[in-house]
Amino acid sequence: MEKNWFFPPHDGIRLGDLADQIGAELLDATAADRAVRAVAPVYRAKAGDVCYMLSRKSREELQTCSATAIICDKAISSLVPDTIPVLLTAKPHTAFALAGTLLHERAMRPSYNTSERGVSPGAFVDSTARLEAGVEVEPMAVIGAGAEIGSGTRIAAGAMIGPGVRIGRDCTISAGVSILCALIGNNVIIHPGTRIGQDGFGYAPGPTGGMIKIVQVGRVIIQDHVEIGANTTIDRGTMDDTVIGEGTKIDNLVQIGHNVRIGRYCGIVSQVGIAGSAQIGDGVMIGGGVGVNGHTSIGSGAQIAAMSGVASDVPAGERYGGIPARPMRDFLRDVAEMALRSSERQKKKGGKDE
């Protein structure tokens, strides 16, 4: 990659210091004073870069690697050339993530859109809104009546913070975000285009046909350290609250319906749709493109495979997949059986489709 001015390299961290901070062991102590400035993939890592390996599949990439260090576990360390220092750890993925936060702090949150600091004269801040010292508001942002925003929070260009919304400290609200009827904790990151707190989808049959809108008078509660991807939508509750638990990470293009409650430290990948009043426990992982039926429950620690359809409750700690979602062992057995039947059918037809 040619020079990347969006994310310039760090001024330099001693390799020995980096090892200490990411919880890794530097196998070659003589390399401790070398400077690390950036992260890079194995195949093009050069002096000043640190990279990581999780699999032997990357061993061919070592032929073009001249990194200052490679983060890996004991099983992979024997593949690394003697010329490249090893940062040994049982959790290389985690260690690399920590290295990234140290070397590229600027990339950990959406970047500033202007060079201005403070409240831009091009923003509209209602006279009854309360902003603590250190809040930054970029041009064309709107802060509604009675809104409260904590110190260190940045409201990016074109964002709309509705009346009475409360946002905690050290949050990043990116460009084009709209937030209504919501209480947001500290250290929350919301990426561009996300919509929070709009009406949930609820209608009843009309007395003479058509549909009558069901009133939506709940809120959205987003706890501390949540990160929400671009163009995700989170509806407010009907009468209760929609809740996103502490530390949960939500990808781009996720739809979360009214009254949904998501626990702490969950991971939800893009294009997931969670229908109203579903209950998600703590530490749940949901793969891309999953649909979750309304009023269902997914227990803590459960994992849902990508493209699955959750039609009924999932017990805690289970791995489910398929449509309808079922225990992974059953899903894989069903897939194998269907493949076998398809193969047998083709043989009966002489390999010709009809």
UniProtKB/Swiss-Prot annotation:
Pfam families: Hexapep, LpxD. Its EC number is 2.3.1.191. It catalyses: a UDP-3-O-[(3R)-3-hydroxyacyl]-alpha-D-glucosamine + a (3R)-hydroxyacyl-[ACP] = a UDP-2-N,3-O-bis[(3R)-3-hydroxyacyl]-alpha-D-glucosamine + holo-[ACP] + H(+). CDD domains: LbH_LpxD. Disulfide bonds: none annotated. It comes from the Bacteria. One of its GO terms (biological process) is lipid A biosynthetic process. Belongs to the transferase hexapeptide repeat family. LpxD subfamily. HAMAP family: LpxD. This is UDP-3-O-acylglucosamine N-acyltransferase. The gene is lpxD.
